[in-house]
């Protein structure tokens, strides 16, 4: 980052000396604008669960444990006032656990700066860290990638979620819970 500051300082000094062409050449050579092709992002629930399993329900940016989203939704089903859910993640309307513990897929190299939407560029992270990271690279944030966890050691409460649903099949009337239940069964079979 300091090299970039020195480059811009040199550019400003060249401008002050009336050397606009030299300043422009400095920018082009030392701190050029890079236009990246943006690729469409898309993944299925099955792909998400496969990634969460591969990462052992560990937030790859913090090393923290995350949990199967189905658990959160079941808690909201049973306790809508105490553990509210908002379908669009509105922080003022939903429990903070949906941000802190809800796993999502992030692109290690952001799509906005040329990263690809492919599994080798995916990492499990919390919604909160995903929002913080946004379109920034790990280097820009001075973050590092933590090792994946072991699904056999931490399954994100997936087995407990399946047991909970099978203990109260009324939960399957909620389409969201039903989707996560089916996806959970799939990854437990893998």
Q: What does each of the following model-derived ranges do?
A:
Residues 45-102, 126:
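Short cysteine-rich loop/turn motifs with clustered Cys
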Residues 36-40, 109-113, 145:
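Short helix/strand-bridging catalytic loops that position acidic/His residues to coordinate divalent metals
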Residues 56-59, 98-106, 110-131:
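Short beta-strand-alpha-helix junction that forms the catalytic/metal-binding core
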Residues 67-68, 118, 122-144:
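Short Cys/His-centered divalent metal-binding micro-motifs
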Residues 134-165:
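A contiguous, mid-protein "functional segment" used to position or interact
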Residues 2-6, 148, 152, 175:
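Alpha-helix boundary/N-cap detector
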Residues 163-190:
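Short flanking/linker segments adjacent to small metal-binding domains or redox-active Cys/His motifs
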Residues 1-50, 54-56, 63-69:
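A boundary/linker detector
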């Amino acid at each position: 980052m300091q090299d970039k500051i020195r480059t811009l300082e040199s550019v400003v000094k060249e401008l002050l000396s009336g050397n606009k062409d030299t300043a422009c050449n400095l920018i082009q050579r030392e701190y050029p604008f890079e236009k990246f092709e943006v690729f469409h992002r898309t993944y299925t629930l099955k792909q998400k669960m496969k990634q969460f399993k591969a990462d052992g329900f560990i937030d790859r940016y913090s090393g923290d444990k995350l949990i199967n989203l189905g658990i959160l939704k079941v808690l909201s089903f049973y306790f809508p006032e105490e553990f509210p859910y908002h379908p669009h993640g509105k922080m003022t309307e939903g429990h903070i656990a949906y941000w802190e513990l809800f796993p999502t897929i992030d692109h290690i190299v952001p799509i906005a700066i040329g990263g690809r939407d492919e599994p080798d560029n995916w990492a499990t992270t919390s919604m909160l860290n995903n929002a913080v990271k946004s379109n920034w690279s790990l280097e820009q944030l001075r973050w590092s990638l933590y090792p994946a966890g072991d699904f056999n050691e931490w399954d994100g409460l997936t087995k407990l979620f399946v047991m909970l649903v099978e203990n109260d099949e009324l939960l399957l009337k909620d389409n969201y819970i039903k989707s996560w239940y089916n996806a959970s069964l799939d990854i437990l079979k893998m």
